[in-house]
Amino acid sequence: RTAPGSTFKPVTAIAGLSEGVITDNDYIYCGGRFDKLPGAPLNCWLLSGHGALSIRDGIANSCNVFFSETAYRLGQNEEGTFNDNTAMQKLIQYANLMGLDKKSGLEISEASPQVSNELPIPSAIGQGTHSYTTSQLARYATVLASSGNVYNLSLLDKSTDSDGNLIEDYTPEMIDHADLSQSIWDDVHAGMEGVITKSNWGIFQDLNVTLAGKTGTAQQSKNRANHSLFIGYAPADNPQIAWAIRIANGYASTNSELVAKDILNYYFGLKDETEILTGQASSASNSNAGTD
């Protein structure tokens, strides 16, 4: 298990929209740092700042200040006073709604997830005490892709006898549903499509299938490279596949995106297998900069 990094930001977006602390018409200004609470400010990965961002732009640009401000508003009372516990409980509520408080249902041993229970501002951008397996993030990606359907995952499709007769069909079991307004899902989906078309188009521009995604980097130790993460689904308008990729100590999220590109080329038959499995390593980024 590791922290999810910025792949968690859609949860914060959903919480903010559902609780009414942000709307489609709101813009939050990013000047490069969030400094409304005592102590060291929380920096955006873009130190010069993103400027004014809508909810969709906040997701597409993975702006730390946008989601820190959203969490801050979640914790404010009617007088504007901020309460850590109030903000934290709302983030927990919507993380649980996305199924992040449950094991994924796989038929093998799996670590229990940890939804962050302290430090709401860092938690809103995927830090805090969050800790999830890759399979739990894959289930979360499926919830986003399906507009709220929480399924138990399975390693099996079906079992047959030696003659090909069906013994058991492992149809996905829907265990919950996140009942949100369609406008909220539209904002999240558009933001995740923007991650691809606005922020990472150079990687996917020659891929003949549309996709939506969310990148992430998670720091576990200052002495080791960040973990590289990328969740998503495709095609963007009618998902057939959802995924979560984590490369332990894999530096930038770009490296996970390159893995996803190979998977999609193979899954949709866009490239011959011999073009994908070359026996040679791809060029990878060894930058440890947090740009998502």
Name the predicted role of every residue range.
Residues 137, 252-261:
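Short, charged, low-complexity patches
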Residues 240, 252-254, 270:
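Intrinsically disordered, low-complexity acidic/polar segments
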Residues 166-168, 173, 259-292:
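Short, gly/Ser/Thr-rich active-site loops of penicillin-recognizing serine hydrolases
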Residues 1-6, 11-248, 289-292:
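Beta-lactam-recognizing serine transpeptidase/beta-lactamase-like catalytic domain environment
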